[in-house]
Regions:
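Conserved P-loop NTP-binding catalytic core
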Residues: 40-102
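Electropositive, glycine-dotted interaction segments
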Residues: 70, 88-159
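Short acidic, gly/pro-rich beta-turn/loop elements at beta-sheet edges
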Residues: 16, 30, 81-83, 118
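Generic intrinsically disordered, low-complexity segments enriched for polar/acidic and small residues
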Residues: 8-11, 25, 37, 43-44, ...
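Beta-strand secondary-structure signal
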Residues: 5-7, 19, 70-74, 105-107
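Beta-strand elements of well-folded, non-transmembrane domains
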Residues: 26, 75-79, 110-114
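Pre-Walker A-like glycine/lysine-rich segment at the N-terminus of P-loop NTPase domains
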Residues: 1-48, 57-66
């Protein structure tokens, strides 16, 4: 896989969402305190490097009292297929895990309030299909799914 883009929001000097393109050869040039090292520190946090620790001092000072700190990475050239278990081989596209550009985009999000960071949440920014009445299927428990199906069962059997 190749890293194509780094996404930063409310991380140190990056208040609004910034998308930093990465190519095969990328150089960061700028004045002192312009945020060059922050990009590398954000990558260390994203990839769980032992030196990449995040704390409340990493929240952008202009972010306000509450919000979310976001570190994301966009990847290309990922494997053609992935093996879930011995009998299940699929692709990221078949699992609807790719963004609108056909790339794998993963974000780590830390909500904060009054200078306190909460536990991270990890999201795939994906172009997932939608249909009326089927919102939030991935977050529903089995009983809720059965209830949803009973409500629409007749519509689909009568076609």
């Amino acid at each position: 896989m190749f890293l194509r883009e780094v996404v930063l929001q409310n991380f140190r000097g990056y208040k609004n969402q910034h998308r930093i393109p990465i190519d095969q050869l990328t150089a960061f040039i700028g004045k002192n305190d312009a945020g060059k090292s922050s990009i590398f520190d954000a990558l260390a946090v994203f990839f769980d490097h032992p030196l990449g620790k995040i704390d409340a001092s990493d929240i952008c000072v202009h972010a306000g009292a509450s919000g979310e700190l976001r570190i994301g990475c966009v990847f290309s050239d990922f494997p053609n297929s992935i093996t879930i278990d011995a009998s299940s081989i699929t692709t990221l596209a078949e699992e609807f895990l790719l963004n609108v550009d056909g790339l794998l985009e993963i974000h780590k999000v830390y909500e904060f309030s009054d200078g306190v960071l909460k536990k991270q949440k990890i999201f795939a920014i994906a172009n997932h299909p939608t249909a009326e009445g089927f919102d939030g299927l991935l977050s529903k428990k089995n009983a809720e799914l059965k209830k949803s199906w009973r409500g629409c069962e007749y519509r689909y059997r009568s076609r």
